[in-house]
């Protein structure tokens, strides 16, 4: 296998983390909204936890993107 093809395959596999981050963010917001509809008084208390979960899930996706870009352009 050529080096260029291996780089493309590796970057594609590393980019799968972006799909995982998208699914995770969807689950986080979906669960927050269902909980907020059940108990609106607790929604304001849970909002900081929502933002923390969103940031952690997004950071995971961004790390995967950085790894994919490093594989493509640094090696």
Swiss-Prot record:
Give the InterPro entries listed for this entry. Answer: ATP_synth_F0_csu (IPR000454), ATP_synth_F0_csu_sf (IPR038662), ATPase_proteolipid_c-like_dom (IPR002379), F/V-ATP_Csub_sf (IPR035921)
The principal location of this protein is: membrane
How does this protein lie in the membrane?
Multi-pass membrane protein
Q: Where are the transmembrane segments?
A: 9-29, 54-74
Disulfide bridge positions per record: none
Localization = Cell inner membrane
Q: Does the keyword DNA-binding apply?
A: no
Q: Where is this site: Reversibly protonated during proton transport?
A: 58
Q: Which GO terms describe its cellular component?
A: plasma membrane; proton-transporting ATP synthase complex; proton-transporting two-sector ATPase complex, proton-transporting domain
A Gene Ontology molecular function term of the record: lipid binding
- Top-level taxonomic group: Bacteria
Q: Which UniProt keywords apply?
A: ATP synthesis, Cell inner membrane, Cell membrane, CF(0), Hydrogen ion transport, Ion transport, Lipid-binding, Membrane, Transmembrane, Transmembrane helix, Transport
Family of this protein:
Belongs to the ATPase C chain family.
Please describe what this protein does. F(1)F(0) ATP synthase produces ATP from ADP in the presence of a proton or sodium gradient. F-type ATPases consist of two structural domains, F(1) containing the extramembraneous catalytic core and F(0) containing the membrane proton channel, linked together by a central stalk and a peripheral stalk. During catalysis, ATP synthesis in the catalytic domain of F(1) is coupled via a rotary mechanism of the central stalk subunits to proton translocation. Key component of the F(0) channel; it plays a direct role in translocation across the membrane. A homomeric c-ring of between 10-14 subunits forms the central stalk rotor element with the F(1) delta and epsilon subunits.
Report quaternary structure and partners.
F-type ATPases have 2 components, F(1) - the catalytic core - and F(0) - the membrane proton channel. F(1) has five subunits: alpha(3), beta(3), gamma(1), delta(1), epsilon(1). F(0) has three main subunits: a(1), b(2) and c(10-14). The alpha and beta chains form an alternating ring which encloses part of the gamma chain. F(1) is attached to F(0) by a central stalk formed by the gamma and epsilon chains, while a peripheral stalk is formed by the delta and b chains.
Q: List, alphabetically, the NCBIfam families matched.
A: PRK07558.1
Q: What is this protein called?
A: ATP synthase subunit c
Q: Which gene encodes it?
A: atpE
